Regions:
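Classical Sec-dependent N-terminal signal peptides that target proteins to the secretory pathway
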Residues: 2-26
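Surface-exposed receptor/substrate recognition regions of extracellular proteins
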Residues: 35-40, 44-190, 194, 206, ...
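Beta-solenoid repeat scaffold
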Residues: 84-93, 146-149, 153-155, 165-168, ...
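Extracellular beta-strand/beta-solenoid scaffold signature
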Residues: 188, 212-217, 238-251, 268-282, ...
Length: 596
């Protein structure tokens, strides 16, 4: 683990620390030594799981891992864990029970009962819940003479202003129901947009379900964390679709914004006309979305026209430094447009630095699982994700992934690694255009031709020459869900280097390596007829092992219509071929035509 030195010591409270002397605080331990050691071990285990390259900051990791406000000062991190307060610095651990003893505080069960209390300006009131019989939303209030944001009007003409302790509060303490029945849209919008006024940097969502039937427009928010409790924002039939709104959760001009454990799910039983993409990000920096699910169920499309588009997530334009980690993207609409995650720069303002990590993607809709396209995009990492596309829908993806497109001015440094892929499509797995420094490595790939395919199939292809630099250490299983076809099928096309892959071919293909510069150290097991193994390899075909299992090839090496400006090394390959040929179906090791 790479981070600054860390130490845990006793301290009195985060609120005290934010306004008083900072440093190591002495206190009499309130728990037994053995209990303390158990808690310390739990904290250490969580911290040890921190991976520097999987979060925008160590502070963010602490926030969503411990689900706590985090205060940082002079290399000290202060946060809560269970009923304990923690100060963290330099790899030693000490803890203290939170002191909940309150003096001079008036206790009351809920807000309704608070309104008729006989209180004076300056009094502090503590509630156990916001609404009666909900057991959530408790908070402290300061009695004031003037109204203010989220203040409660009292019967005596005074106001109870919620106290934002340690720069954090729950959305339930501000009046959200969190019951999936009452619409919480406006309270959520007001709370987030007023974070600076409330002196709040952490907003907790403590309930399971929040009904939101208005667009959540979040703009110009800085240094804020929304921490859910496996919470889901539900959009149902009462959504306000009188005007078209492309993005439901619309994040714009924000900086340093963390969302964790806050999922979004559509739940429609009528046609909804004013909704499309669940999350959109525009002109924003340092956005981290973790531990959440974006769900568009199959029922959504059944109520719509087939040409409607539904997409989970769209990094739309002008973004920088985004992390999406441990999320689920479910899009089962079977629509003729829409996909899982768009990474684009719509107005060519420049976008860079995004990581998509440890997530699950399941899609039936027509378009890509992940598409990197349009404008100028730099530095994309797609790592350790699981992708699933089955052949059950009426619609099917043309390609599963796009890395650069005809609309791309720049698509540079795209790394696709350590993913587990089980997909089908009508056109191909990965297509790349106008991209540079594209690397595909260490993936497990099961790619199939869809039963709906009626045109040529290219599994991994650069649509202009050599935009994919390297395909390395992948395990590829290729097959077809279409029993009979006459179109061309290409596996690797226009690649600079294909290195150390294991490839299994279970259906008829045209060629395995087409216009690949170098093919080195690959193991290929072929179980169906193939026309060509290597077509116009330009530099090296070296140390490969190619095995044919009761099937034949037309020509192993095929060269046609190219200029040879340098030597081509074909060395140290092993070819296992036991097919019994006849004079009518003879195979050729090398065939060359129209060379110059």
């Amino acid at each position: 683990m790479c981070m600054k030195k860390i130490y845990l010591a006793l301290f009195l409270s985060l609120l005290t620390l934010s306004s008083c002397n900072k440093g190591v605080i002495s206190s009499t331990p309130l728990t037994s030594s053995s209990s303390n050691e158990i808690i310390k071990s739990e904290i250490k285990n969580i911290i040890d799981d921190y991976k520097l390259d999987e979060s925008l900051s160590f502070s963010n990791y602490l926030k969503y891992s411990f689900r706590s406000h985090v205060y940082f000062n002079n290399e000290y991190y202060y946060f809560n864990y269970k009923e304990y307060e923690v100060e963290y610095y330099e790899n030693n651990i000490n803890i203290k029970l939170v002191d909940n003893k309150n003096t001079n505080i008036i206790n009351v069960q809920n807000v309704e009962l608070m309104t008729n209390l006989e209180v004076n300006v300056g009094d502090i009131v503590k509630t156990n819940e916001y609404y009666a019989d909900t057991n959530k939303g408790g908070a402290k209030y300061e009695i004031c003479s003037e109204d203010s944001l989220f203040a409660i009007a009292l019967d005596n003409g005074l106001y109870a202003k919620p106290i934002v302790e340690n720069n954090s509060i729950s959305i339930e303490s501000l009046g959200a129901y969190g019951d999936g029945i009452h619409d919480d849209s406006q309270i959520i919008i007001n709370a987030i947009s007023s974070a600076k006024e409330l002196n709040m940097d952490t907003l907790f969502f403590n309930s399971s379900n929040y009904l939101c039937n208005s667009k959540l427009d979040i703009g110009e928010v800085n240094e804020l964390a929304l921490l859910g409790n496996n919470s889901t924002i539900i959009v149902n039939d009462n959504y306000d679709d009188t005007d078209y709104k492309e993005f439901f959760l619309n994040i714009w001009n924000c900086n340093d914004f963390l969302l964790s454990g806050i999922s979004i799910s559509y739940d429609f039983s009528r046609a909804i006309n004013g909704i499309k993409t669940q999350v959109g990000i525009h002109n924003s920096k340092k956005i981290e979305y973790v531990n959440s699910t974006f769900n568009i169920p199959d029922s959504t499309l059944k109520l719509q026209t087939k040409d409607r588009e539904f997409t989970n997530f769209d990094c739309y334009q002008g973004w920088e430094d985004i992390v999406i980690n441990n999320c689920n993207f479910i899009n089962l609409t079977d629509s003729s447009a829409g996909g899982s995650l768009w990474i684009r720069d719509f107005r060519n303002t420049g976008s860079k630095n995004i990581k998509v990590l440890n997530s699950y993607f399941h899609k039936i809709a027509h378009d890509e699982l992940i598409a990197v396209f349009m404008g100028s995009i730099q530095n994309v990492i797609i790592r350790n994700n699981t992708f699933k596309v089955e052949d059950s829908g009426e619609s099917s993806s043309v390609m599963n992934f796009t890395f650069g497109s005809a609309s791309s001015k720049l698509a540079d440094n795209i790394i696709f690694e350590k993913n587990n892929i089980d997909v089908c499509s009508t056109g191909g797995l990965i297509w790349s255009t106008n991209a540079t420094n594209v690397i595909i490595r260490d993936n497990i790939i099961k790619s199939s031709i869809s039963s709906k395919t009626n045109n040529n199939f290219r599994m991994i292809e650069s649509l202009n020459e050599n935009t994919i630099d390297l395909i390395q250490n992948n395990h590829v299983i290729f097959s077809s869900l279409l029993k009979d076809y006459s179109f061309q099928v290409h596996i690797f096309k226009n690649i600079k280097e294909v290195l150390n892959n294991t490839v299994e071919i279970n259906c008829k293909i045209t060629d395995l390596f087409l216009d690949v510069n170098s093919v080195i150290d690959n193991i290929c097991n072929i179980y169906s007829n193939v026309d060509f193994i290597s077509y116009n390899t330009k530099e090296k075909f070296k140390s490969n092992k190619i095995s044919f299992n009761s099937c034949k090839f037309g020509s192993f090496f095929r060269y046609y219509g190219i200029t040879l400006n340098s030597n081509i090394d074909i060395v140290d390959n092993i070819i296992n071929y036991t097919y019994s040929e006849s004079s009518e179906d003879a195979s050729y090791i090398i065939m060359a035509n129209d060379m110059y």
